[in-house]
């Protein structure tokens, strides 16, 4: 029997699949409404704060993102602690190191990447925007791709507000709201830079530092409101005007105007026979109570953000 000869197959060169062209369109388009806020911190109560957190736990972080933004604006101590964390990163030097220092191709790639980063305007601002994740749990920037002499290059990197993103209630996937698809839109590959910071274990919507210190912010806010009201009542002596039993309405009106003028100008005139008395109040113990409570809240914020209170203020302190 003749045996059929098997043909020996020649090895074929395997061609790498072409890389997909980067999407040069702007996906997470900044909307005019992004700069506006519902200001959820106005009239904030424990009940409202819990409601905002429940919405974020369900995937909708819009009101939580707006609240966190206001917290940084309204609390100078909180702002300074977060800036300390961010400046510790932006102040560092960075270097692009080739994967293989002996491979000329790797050196060429490293030099290209370094030139790209150096050519991006405001690169430190971009890093600062991404470090916003420390407080809010995540931060997103969109890469605007372009072409230059046959190379795909980074034309710009634009920060996107956290309230444009959400977690899907069905599969918990991270999605972005766009002008075309306000309900759901998947994040595209190599298009968005997402920095997720985990101050603690759990879902990213609950992992930011500001989620931890929000209650201290609320209690301090109550304390400051009461302190301001206290200062308005007891911050200056009570001006008590006295008039004679037979004083006319014009005399009474003149006395009242004199009392008001003394409050603004520390001077006034009034008819002869009337008297103005200044009644001093001693409420130092209440003042100390407000100050101690506000300082306590600041110390807890410092511990949560920096891990200590020693370097937070010019005075003494202790490590947490």
Label the predicted regions.
Residues 10-79, 84-88, 96-262:
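Structured, contiguous alpha/beta core segments that scaffold functional sites
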